[in-house]
Amino acid sequence: MINRIHHFLSTSGNLLSCSENHYYKWRFGNIKYDKKGKGTPLLFIHDLTAGSSSYEFHQLINNLTDQHEIYTLDLLGYGLSDKPSITYTNNLYEQLITDFIKNIIGKKTSVVATGNSVPFVIMACHNNPEFFDKMIFINPQSLYSQNQIPSKQTKLLKFIFDTPVIGTFIYN
């Protein structure tokens, strides 16, 4: 009952819906994105915190549509994109960004990334420089802190959260 009330209250404003939503059928699920404006392409990548989505940029993008073709997307597992039961890694998001630019935008693109999304944007640019023009980072995290190998404790916690009964109980 509490979850239903919480769901109703959190979705009553319908903040993520938009008449201009598009979906990119990627190999791990449908990726929701919006496209506005004309000019040089500019892709916005949101942070990886709970509750993040392309909605983070809704006030900013209208100021840029005169000179740029703006793309905002909800990363896999966020916003209105699919949320498959897989392990989300920087490599997964690197592939998503590269495939999105290659298959949807189709030309060299400038990217604006925030917070924890910065490392996989850097990796994507390093591995596929032909798809990237400029990179703009907002509040980037330390690359050192993002380059840590999971400890035994972290692996144990992931195992516990992935266990159907225990993980579902903890999340709900």
Model-derived segments and spans:
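Active-site loop/oxyanion-hole signature of alpha/beta-hydrolase fold enzymes
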Residues: 72-112
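Flexible "cap/lid" loop of the alpha/beta hydrolase fold
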Residues: 122-127, 132-165
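Conserved HGGG/HGGXW glycine-rich cap/lid loop of the alpha/beta-hydrolase fold
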Residues: 27-29, 34-80
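Structural signature of beta-strand start/N-cap positions in the alpha/beta core
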Residues: 41, 69, 108-110, 131-134
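Conserved catalytic-core motifs of eukaryotic protein kinase domains, centered on the activation segment
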Residues: 54-56, 81-87, 146-148
